[in-house]
Each structure stands twice: as structure tokens, then as C-alpha cells.
Design a protein with these regions (language model features):
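Preference for long, amphipathic alpha-helical scaffolds in soluble/luminal domains
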Residues: 1-173
Length: 173
């Protein structure tokens, strides 16, 4: 695992500000992109999972070698939380649904609203790092978002896995 994390560490985007900087000009870059060599579009859920893996390695004896990367990833994720408490994949507060009615928006992906599955991974990361709803505004707001978006049947929708099983297991984990 350490070899893989050592491969991931230098791929953290620390000096390129993508589109997200428009809404969060005071937030420093600190995420990882799901695509190789795409520093303009780091994403929040992959960043959360990389941070969790680095934290697990740290607890398993890797020492402080990942501390700076973890701290910067957490800083970026917290800075990217949307007003409603959730997190989106790549952006923040990008919720102008009318944009999906533009004729060339045939797949309805011109916006990047907060989603349950991405929010769940960010919440999981914060909890794994020892934050609680009592001492972390970001975690408290994220949990509130998940409570608000749970459906009457108990499930959550997963945008990126495109089904309710995906969204529900992501939230429960």
C-alpha cells in the first residue's frame, strides 16, 4: 500500500486552480483527479478516499510521511463544501438547473450539484480523521445534508453509481 500511496502523493494537485476557483478564490488547491494528468479537475470523492488511505497507512506505521498531503486534501475538501452542506464531484454551488435545458446539454451534465454519494465519502473522511458533529461544522453540515436527502423508503440516490444501492451503501459506509 505504501508504494501505491507514494505514487499518489506527488499527483496531488497543489498549484493548478481549476474552474472551481471562480466560486472559491480563497481556497488553495489540494485534490486528486480521477483522470491521469488532469490537474484542472480534481474531484472531491477521489480526494477523500486518497486521504482516508493515507490516514490508514499513517495509523499502520507509515509515520508522518503523508501528513502534509492529508492536511492539504482536507483543507481543499472543507473549502469546497456547498451552501446546502453537501459536496459535489468537481465544483461548489453549481446548481443552476436551467442550464440543462440548453440544446447541446443532451445528457444533463452542465451542472455539478452536491450529491449524496460524494457527500458521504467526504463525511466518512472527516469522521475517520476524528472529527465529530459536535466539533466540526463541515461534518455537521454534511450529515445534515445526508439526513435531508434520505428518501422516504430509507435509501439515498447515487449520482455517480447511477442507482439507489450505490448511493445508500456509500452513505452508510
Amino acid at each position: 500500500a505504501v508504494r501505491a500511496l507514494d505514487w499518489l502523493r506527488p499527483r496531488q494537485v497543489l498549484d493548478v486552480a481549476g474552474d472551481w476557483i471562480t466560486r472559491r478564490p480563497d481556497v488553495r488547491p489540494g485534490g486528486w483527479a480521477f483522470q491521469y494528468a488532469n490537474p484542472h479537475y480534481p474531484d472531491l470523492d477521489d480526494t477523500a478516499v486518497v486521504v482516508m488511505a493515507m490516514d490508514r497507512a499513517r495509523r499502520a506505521g507509515a509515520g508522518a510521511r503523508y501528513d502534509v498531503a492529508i492536511d492539504r486534501g482536507v483543507e481543499w475538501i472543507k473549502g469546497m463544501q456547498s451552501r446546502n452542506g453537501g459536496w459535489a464531484a468537481f465544483d461548489v454551488d453549481n446548481v443552476l438547473h436551467y442550464l440543462n435545458n440548453i440544446p447541446f446539454a443532451d445528457h444533463g451534465a452542465l451542472i455539478d450539484p452536491p450529491t449524496e454519494d460524494v457527500t458521504a465519502r467526504c463525511v466518512s473522511m472527516l469522521a475517520q480523521l476524528g472529527e465529530t458533529v459536535d466539533d466540526s461544522e463541515a461534518l455537521s453540515r454534511g450529515v445534515a445534508y445526508l439526513r435531508e436527502t434520505q428518501l422516504a423508503d430509507g435509501s439515498w440516490y447515487g449520482r455517480w453509481g447511477l442507482n439507489y444501492i450505490y448511493g445508500t451503501w456509500a452513505t452508510l459506509c
